[in-house]
């Protein structure tokens, strides 16, 4: 072997050794946060999460994706097109069961739980001029029930079924995101909107400052007919401008969900960082005040991701 050949062989050996210690380009962790419409609560909370992860997970690249929310988010996770997503609990349950009528092609068996976060209040709001004050008053009126194949739309179906009504009782049904629904009401082209979101959602606040509204009650007796995971709650008086009295309605828990393909360490860090940065979450939207690690496993409808499980064991929440 010539000296030049020996030098080349040595260089190749050193290069190979260094390669074994270098960080491959594929090790960069991309984190796509699946949220909902930009006028809802999922979106600002998702932005906050993205910023928390970008600053706390070394080598991560984060992105926030606006979607049609729960159903779309869960389908995207199953396809590996997101790393963490917001979803309503009943949607998660139906996805795990493979409920095709709810918009799932089959059992979404790759989904894994991260945390229960805050309740979504089912908020039915009508313009005062529409005369709609009760669920029965919606008969013959126009109502937006949320984007097609969204968790909100599934909530709408459950509420009407419990009340002995269906979409056929309405004058017109629109399948629109929150902000678009509000714009139609402002323009007198729609009577009411049903929005499943955290209290103080921006779209309804916007509507309430633009015209007089009625917040329509969903009586506790109707909520009881639906059963779990729905619970009877109250929208406090003055949550929205002109809402002088507390209003009964239903609520469903929200969850953060991931999928089995996301590495354990990444999910561990995502879970840990969220709970360590709750003030930033609350600053993005007041709904985050309800996020509590002690309640993070309440009602979890699917198996936990090992990374989340590791965090809860370290925190003493899971034995």
Language model feature labels by segment:
Residues 20-22:
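N-terminal signal peptide c-region/cleavage motif recognized by signal peptidases
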Residues 141-158, 230-300:
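Ligand-binding clefts/hinges and TM-proximal coupling segments of bilobed small-molecule sensing domains
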Residues 173-176, 180, 186-187, 197-210, ...:
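An extracytoplasmic/periplasmic, membrane-proximal ligand-sensing/linker region
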Residues 1-12:
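Bacterial N-terminal signal peptides that target proteins for export
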Residues 30-56, 60-61, 120-187, 279, ...:
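Bilobed "Venus flytrap"/periplasmic-binding protein-like clamshell domains
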Residues 89, 100-101, 130, 166-257, ...:
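Pocket-lining segment of extracytoplasmic ligand-binding domains
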Residues 104-117, 122, 239-248:
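A structural signal for short loop-to-beta-strand junctions that line the ligand-binding cleft
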Residues 24-27:
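Boundary at the C-terminal end of the N-terminal hydrophobic targeting segment
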């Amino acid at each position: 072997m010539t000296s030049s050949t020996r030098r080349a062989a040595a260089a190749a050996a050193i290069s190979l050794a260094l390669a074994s210690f270098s960080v491959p380009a594929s090790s960069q962790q991309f984190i796509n946060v699946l949220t909902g419409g930009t006028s809802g609560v999922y979106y600002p909370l998702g932005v906050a999460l993205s910023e928390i992860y970008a600053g706390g997970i070394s080598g991560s690249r984060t992105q926030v994706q606006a979607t049609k929310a729960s159903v779309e988010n869960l389908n995207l996770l199953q396809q590996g097109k997101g790393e963490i997503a917001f979803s309503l609990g009943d949607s998660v349950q139906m996805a795990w069961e493979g409920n095709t009528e709810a918009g799932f092609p089959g059992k979404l068996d790759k989904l894994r739980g991260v945390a229960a976060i805050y309740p979504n209040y089912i908020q039915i709001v009508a313009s005062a001029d529409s005369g709609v004050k009760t669920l029965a008053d919606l008969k013959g009126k126009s109502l937006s029930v949320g984007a097609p194949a969204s968790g909100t739309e599934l909530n709408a179906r459950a509420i009407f079924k419990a009340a002995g009504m269906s979409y056929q009782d309405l004058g017109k049904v629109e399948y629109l995101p929150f902000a678009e629904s509000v714009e139609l009401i402002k323009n007198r082209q729609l009577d009411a909107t049903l929005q499943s979101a955290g209290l103080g959602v921006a779209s309804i606040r916007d509507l309430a400052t633009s015209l007089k509204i009625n917040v329509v009650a969903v009586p506790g007796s109707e909520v009881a007919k639906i059963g779990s995971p729905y619970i009877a709650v109250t929208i406090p008086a003055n949550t929205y401008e002109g809402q002088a009295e507390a209003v009964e309605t239903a609520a469903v828990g929200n969850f953060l969900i991931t999928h089995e393909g996301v590495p354990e360490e990444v999910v561990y860090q995502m879970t840990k960082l969220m709970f360590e940065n709750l003030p930033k979450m609350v600053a993005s939207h007041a709904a985050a005040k309800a996020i509590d690690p002690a309640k993070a496993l309440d009602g979890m409808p699917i198996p936990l991701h090992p990374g989340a499980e590791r965090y809860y064991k370290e925190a003493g929440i899971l034995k």
